[in-house]
Amino acid sequence: MQQSKEERVHDVFEKISDKYDVMNSVISFQRHKAWRKETMRIMDVKPGSKALDVCCGTADWTIALAGAVGEDGKVYGLDFSENMLAVGKQKVEALELKQVELIHGNAMELPYEDNTFDYVTIGFGLRNVPDYMQVLKEMTRVVKPGGKVICLETSQPTMIGFRQGYVLYFKYIMPLFGKMFAKSYKEYSWLQESASTFPGMKELACMFEEAGLKNVQVKPFTFGVAAMHLGIKPESK
């Protein structure tokens, strides 16, 4: 019987968890760290804030958020892969980050009350969920009025020539890197599939607005290989 997208994605991340961080650096040529750093600068996270990192994986962005909110803040990281969370927990414990709590859960149905967080992030995870809009609506639901919802994700380059090279890289080269460095050709073939079908920047910005967010900002990175989308939940009337 054919697996659902959710089942397939779960299997992928359970299998690649121990090599995920290394492969992120290989695949993005280390650029993902700079993209996240610039996104954090734009977010302007305030000390003492409360944040949720959805599809947190091995907790890199969760940890960055913890540094920004400080000891008086609180950061929750949520992921449905227990193996990815196990890697993240090792990092959090090594850094003795008492303000971080990692949770096994589903992005499609966040286990939090409405209007709970100042910031809700998702990094390189939205393309892997079964329903993009459902997750965006859930993120919007749990952020406070005036709070920010942020997505950092692969995108669709528009520059002629570069786009063709990007497609070839993701379709053929990235799975080979997966086989070479992580012994996971099949799993990294899935990652290129999910990236190739993900909405472009303009479409995702419209989805942010449809989810109920305002003042949507879009920041492309590296000729549009990745992009940040940031939206603000309107204040209650």
From Swiss-Prot:
Spell out the InterPro entries in the cross-references.
MenG_heptapren, SAM-dependent_MTases_sf, UbiE/COQ5_MeTrFase, UbiE/COQ5_MeTrFase_CS
Against SUPFAM superfamilies, the record matches this protein to: S-adenosyl-L-methionine-dependent methyltransferases
Q: Which major enzyme category is it?
A: transferase
GO molecular function list: demethylmenaquinone methyltransferase activity
Q: Fetch the Pfam families from UniProt.
A: Ubie_methyltran (PF01209)
Enumerate the Gene Ontology biological process terms.
menaquinone biosynthetic process; methylation
EC number annotated for this UniProt entry:
2.1.1.163
Record's protein name: Demethylmenaquinone methyltransferase
Q: Which organism is it from?
A: Bacillus mycoides (strain KBAB4) (Bacillus weihenstephanensis)
